[in-house]
Amino acid sequence: ALPILSKGDIHRGGRSVAKVELDNGTILYYKPHSLDKNIKYQELYNYLCRKTGISCRTVQYLSHDSYGWEEKIENIPCKNESEVEHYYFRMGIHLFLGYALGATDLHGENIIAHGEYPVIIDMETYPGYLKQQSEKDGSSVEEKINKSTEIKLANSVIHTGMLPVLTWGRGNRGVLISAMGTEEKIKTPFKLPVVKDDKTSDIHIEYEPVEMQIKECIVRLNDQVINAADYTECIIRGFCRAYMVTMADKKVEVMLSGFFDGRSRVVLRHTQQYAMYLMASFHPDYMKSRECRKALLNVIHKEGESSFMKEIHDYEIDSLLEMDIPCFEIDANSRSVYDGNGGEHKEYLPCTPYESWRMHMKQMSYSDMECQCDYIRLSMEMLKASDGKKKMFPTRIKGYDTDKERKIYSQIRKIVHRI
């Protein structure tokens, strides 16, 4: 017997990840896309690990043009303090690669803590699109600084998804999400439909906050859950070592450029939002006909939307009507965005992802490395502030030389506190 369990979101006509257990107990994951990028990433990551003097774990892949097989990686604890330190050093290397490639999806569900080895299991959004400032961005000095700040954050380590950020709300009402691992359950600040009294004649739906827990990225030392904030400097050491190797070794940049030979997934709308639209359309009032469901889903359209956005929204609605979560891709050498049905929507991007990445790489420097380290420290401080007694952020950050940089950092502080 081969027990098969569908995992993850459904895209492109019902395709999804599947967990397969073989007769001998081996567990594999079937993925409905090529795993060539996973193999490239592993080669690059292994190279940086060797250059920084640390070992790495090799994941077994079998990749084909339109699908692939991947071994199951177990969440297991570290055996000693040294392994914990090595884990976060390796996380620093992963964080650098996410930063260098513009990744935005390194959240807890995509990283597994396998002893001293953090393993990334989803590479669909590699490489991402790195925003660049245009002469048209803002007419006043303040507008230009605000736009520069926005782009600086969007292209920073914060935007990778690996570091702690507040989402789904602000201040004390926000939810802290990261790939650094926490035993605490996440409670949504909004209500979701929940089935009550299942399998009885009183079955009904109530709306209430939902609790969730991301377990696979939790780091443990034996039975003790580790607070990643205590290992911030290990993360920074791994990040800086990988950064400096990249600046000194041209082979790394060549290996990075190898990711820009095809397409990668881009997130135009959060999956959670699509899931809520889909769930709402399953209400009995709208399941009477396809037209009723479409009438509800038409709320995706916005008044006064451009013809370009109308095309995007039409695809999203059609995809949801087919019970799929909409998905989009960008091509490394095109300004277009492509939907899950193969449709091309031209001139979505101001420049190609490859051109944008080249500009991003040119901006790398020791000054930028220090700036990213400041962001890491700022973000990791959130994990120390859960008791409400400690300051959320340090009061003084060094490393800014010009008046413009100080103004930009002032704006960043305002944005971070506002978030």
Where are these regions (language model features)?
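Conserved ATP-binding subdomain of kinase catalytic cores across diverse folds
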Residues: A1-A103, Y117, Q372
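Regulatory N- and C-terminal appendages and interdomain linkers associated
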Residues: A1-E43, P118-V119, P164-I419
